[in-house]
């Protein structure tokens, strides 16, 4: 071995050792400046002999040239998600289910961890060397983020120690500590860059950079929590034992992993972590509870996309107090007027909240809310801000009532509130600019006509410049006219025109959904399309005939009937067809001739599916003669419950309706 090769090997070994002490053991032996000096020395030597650079060298973390797109990686072992519980009662019920399934009265030993609020990733090591990394994606296929993961200093490019498996895929969470998040946003505000709403968004944005050099500048870190592939080696037979082995090989593991020998010990762990949450230095949204024994995990198995041996115990939504500075009124695509509270900005669960929906006039009355009031804000599910209550004991002297508008705040048309409904609506229809904008945004959306590149800002400009009044006008746009819009060059304009042309080929169900008929969602649109087959038959249907469609009651039937009775709506449909919008002719299915357990059955899908998309499942069920409905009723024959099935599953059980899981559905589809 040449002297320079020996020097390179020693430097790399030294740097890996100090990375391990810093990121895994949290016990650095040298100052950052000394680490930087060693890194500079290694870079200088590698510059002299680039032929001696190895892929696992610490210098190779900075990334290669920017990518144009992410490749896909299929997970050999699916990356499953967890079911959630939100209170002690639900956790104790979960604990009982586990014990009942194990037919044991002895307490289960639980391994409890933090539920990190970051991005789940899988990292594959072959003979101890990092070879690939991927996002969770849909659980089956993720994005190849290898170049970006290599830039995260907490993740070893090469494992160290003995008995490392030939192939080892570890799973874990990439996240951004709060200090790093604040620094990124501080720099962004100073330079006019993108300011992130919370550390999770910043971590996601950093990890999905096409340029790994940008990712390298972000202080991302990582904790390992599980394993996917294991070949050519062995691991301990407990979850905690595996985590300790990962740590010995150089992978970072949270120091808050704890074994609990009773349900009460789990609850104590949960409450201790909840109390420490503000001081952890990074965001979490609960704790994860897993059966520690791998043998018991195997015995318990899986259901749908989640293991029976683990659960996420989520924290309650965080709340903060702030002041309502004003209330504004927004108009949606159906004319619904929604009051929105403008708040004194406040941090809630890691997000700066300045607005909260007030839903409707009844909600304002229920709260007894006045402008100027001090209120409690909650981020329900840590996402949607809402006003929980007014702090009446601290009501300021200078408050004023909230006056609901008698005319549309956008177009000035009269407003109406139908008896029995909580929503107040603008009566202006498409003469209302707000309704027109929202209707067009819905029309071009991904699940409707799916016009790629037609974003909200483009729609706003088209309406404001009076270029577009109805959906049919979209298909009359030219690249020349679009080029006149802000930030729209000739190439982008032509891309939009091409996307509009492509969108003309659709399905009857998508077309109905795109029309934006009140109360007609995707499932109802699919049901109407399947039942009537043609637009002509649907337009001619009476209210009674419409109610024969699964999931369509008197309210929905009336909305559909009234929509097609309106001459202006019929005119728009005629224009759309004249512009070339079309869909395949219906395939007539004789249910009596179909040999399938689904033929003639009304089926409801609920929860998430892991083996296929919901759209694919619906299409296959319909092809086998099923009627797929969007809600559970006495007319429902079968409910297919995927992951995180909620109220629909509960209602099915209450009504005694037959319920099957995804695995059984797939078996029956192939029957």
Swiss-Prot record:
Residue intervals of the BRCT domain: 593-671
Positions bound to Zn(2+): 408, 411, 426, 432
The UniProt record lists the keyword Transport: no
Active site: 115
Organism: Salmonella paratyphi A (strain AKU_12601)
Gene name, Swiss-Prot/TrEMBL: ligA
Record-given protein name: DNA ligase
GO terms classed as biological process: DNA repair; DNA replication
Sequence intervals crossing the membrane: none
Homology family: Belongs to the NAD-dependent DNA ligase family. LigA subfamily.
An annotated GO cellular component: cytosol
Function: DNA ligase that catalyzes the formation of phosphodiester linkages between 5'-phosphoryl and 3'-hydroxyl groups in double-stranded DNA using NAD as a coenzyme and as the energy source for the reaction. It is essential for DNA replication and repair of damaged DNA.
NCBIfam families: dnlj, PRK07956.1
Sorted UniProt keywords: DNA damage, DNA repair, DNA replication, Ligase, Magnesium, Manganese, Metal-binding, NAD, Zinc
Source organism, top-level taxon: Bacteria
Catalysed reaction, written as an equation: NAD(+) + (deoxyribonucleotide)n-3'-hydroxyl + 5'-phospho-(deoxyribonucleotide)m = (deoxyribonucleotide)n+m + AMP + beta-nicotinamide D-nucleotide
Its EC number(s): 6.5.1.2
